Amino acid sequence: MQFMIRTQAGATSSLARLAMLLAVFACASCGPQVIEGRPPFIGISDMSLLDDTLSVNFRISNQNGVPMNIEAIDIEVTIDSARLAGENRPLKLTIDANSAEEVHVEQLPEAFTRDLLASLENREVNSLPFFLKGSVQTLEDGRLRFEQKGHLYPVPGKPGFFRSAVTQAEELRREERL
């Protein structure tokens, strides 16, 4: 008889433990959930050097199903560690879900930049390797850093226009919050 009592008590405690475990899982699934999406992809859409003005369009792609709110950008393009173009400023930009926007930058290039792009346009070199790095400040995820390597090429039939091809990209990384 004692054996039967112990078995029933053991079964009762096992059922109680199982019920408590199910209650914990149920409570955990009801709490707030943090959903992190994919960071945006940033690249050079096009570049031109016309009338001593360097124009660059940076394409920012939102690869998520929800809008992304950008508050600031810091983008720099370098060739052989010499600054080619860039932008660092506050920017209020909402990018709709699964879409892209472009940020247009115009500046007066230095003589070195003009000479580099002229050598590319005149086919003295086939391409110019570039390094694109920087960060975007988003409302949702804070500061996201990015880096990529690629090459600039002249656009056939369009003097003064250049296109880019990315050869190596690192996904944006969240900076550690202080």
Stretch-by-stretch model annotation:
Residues M1-C30:
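Sec-dependent bacterial lipoprotein signal peptides
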Residues G65-L84:
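Short acidic, flexible loop segments centered on an aromatic residue
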